[in-house]
Structures are given as structure tokens and as C-alpha cells.
């Protein structure tokens, strides 16, 4: 239940590394979304790539507080003033809403890279003028390769992502309640695993 989102996160970070014009450890990074994939992207950046110049944004303050226990980053609401225009070398958009895509393109620095991971809203408008004029790289990322998955299993087996106390386990009978909390934005845990 954790290997799949961790492999998605690792794959996204590896694609970012391939497309950035400077090392990840020297890049100013914004992670949009504090769910499992956003947090796992941050953990891969922290633990595997020595990146700590990270801001994570999410409207769910309680979830950000939970992520702050495990991730070296600054944690802010999406409307926080620290998310400035033309400010980030790398943005990992793990939400997939039109509003987060707009914020990503607005906040990316000239020559920066946006990794689009989230799939909540499959369509919407996008500022292609800025993308073109400022030579922003936009990379769509979906799933992972077999090699990424094998590397993820090794990372998880060796406990390289640290304490996984941010995962919440619930009885399968409470699945509907969990999905409602996720949908309503009140779920604290970045990842819930339902146990039959």
C-alpha cells in the first residue's frame, strides 16, 4: 500500500532531477499537496537527494502539522505570501486542480521545471505564454518504471524514508468515513490504509 505511491514519488523526483538546470540540493522547491505523494516526494528529496530548501503547501493545516513531524521543509497555506511569483526552480504539483496548476505556473521561476503529478481535474486552462516566454519545462509524470519500483522497495526495506508514523491504519468498515474525510479536506493523515 505504500510501495506504489512511494514509487510514483521517486519517479517524479528522478524526472525532476533529469530536467532541472541545477542540482536538486541547490534548488528552491515548492511541493503542492500534503497527501501521500506530496509527502513522499518531500521525503525522497530530503533523505535521498539532500534537498531541504522546500516549501510544502496545503489548505489542510492539521495535515501540514502532521507532515512537519517527518519532513524538513516550511509548511504553508496555498495563499501564503512565501509562495511568490517567479520564485521556485522546481514545483511538484501533486494535487491536479486547475487552481494549483495556475499557482504553479505563476510561481515557477524563469527556466524552472514543473512536475505535474496530480490528476484531480484532468482539464482546464493554463498560461502557455509564460511557459513559452520564460522557457519553463513542464513534465507530466504518471506511475513509475520497473527500475523505480525496485529502487523504491530497497529504500523502504532499508527504512531510508524514516519514521512512517504518518500512515494511519483503519478498519475496512470505516473506509467510507475515511474517504469522506479525504474528500472534505479534514483528514489529518497523509495516507490511510484500510485493514480488512
What are these language model-derived features?
Residues 102, 146, 150-196:
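C-terminal hydrophobic helical "lid"/dimerization subdomain
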Residues 73-80, 169-174:
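Short acidic-hydrophobic, aromatic-tinged amphipathic segments that line or gate anion-handling sites
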Residues 31, 93, 116:
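Redox-cofactor binding/interface segments in oxidoreductases and associated redox assembly factors
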Residues 99-158, 195-196:
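Glycine-rich phosphate-binding loop and adjacent beta-alpha segment
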Residues 1-78:
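Mid-domain Rossmann-like dinucleotide-binding core that forms the NAD(H)/NADP(H) cofactor-binding site
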Residues 25-28, 88, 111:
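Phosphate-coordination loops involved in phosphoryl transfer and adenosine-cofactor binding
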Residues 82-91:
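A short acidic, Gly/Pro-enriched loop at the edge of an enzyme's catalytic core
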Residues 23, 95, 107-109:
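A generic alpha-to-beta junction signature in SAM-dependent methyltransferases
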Amino acid at each position: 500500500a505504500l510501495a506504489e505511491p512511494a514509487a510514483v514519488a521517486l519517479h517524479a523526483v528522478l524526472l525532476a532531477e533529469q530536467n532541472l538546470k541545477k542540482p536538486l540540493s541547490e534548488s528552491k522547491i515548492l511541493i503542492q499537496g500534503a497527501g501521500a505523494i506530496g509527502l513522499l516526494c518531500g521525503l525522497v528529496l530530503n533523505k535521498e537527494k539532500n534537498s531541504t530548501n522546500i516549501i510544502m503547501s496545503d489548505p489542510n493545516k492539521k495535515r501540514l502539522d502532521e507532515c512537519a513531524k517527518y519532513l524538513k521543509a516550511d509548511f504553508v497555506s496555498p495563499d501564503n505570501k512565501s509562495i511568490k511569483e517567479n520564485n521556485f526552480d522546481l514545483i511538484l504539483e501533486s494535487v491536479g486542480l486547475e487552481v494549483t496548476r495556475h499557482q504553479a505556473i505563476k510561481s515557477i521561476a524563469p527556466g524552472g521545471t514543473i512536475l505535474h503529478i496530480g490528476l484531480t481535474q484532468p482539464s482546464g486552462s493554463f498560461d502557455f505564454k509564460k511557459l513559452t516566454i520564460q522557457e519553463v519545462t513542464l513534465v507530466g509524470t504518471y506511475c513509475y518504471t520497473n527500475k523505480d519500483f525496485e529502487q523504491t522497495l530497497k529504500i523502504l526495506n532499508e527504512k531510508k524514508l524514516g519514521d512512517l508514523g504518518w500512515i494511519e491504519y483503519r478498519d475496512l468498515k470505516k473506509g467510507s468515513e475515511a474517504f469522506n474525510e479525504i474528500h472534505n479536506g479534514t483528514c489529518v493523515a497523509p495516507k490511510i490504509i484500510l485493514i480488512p
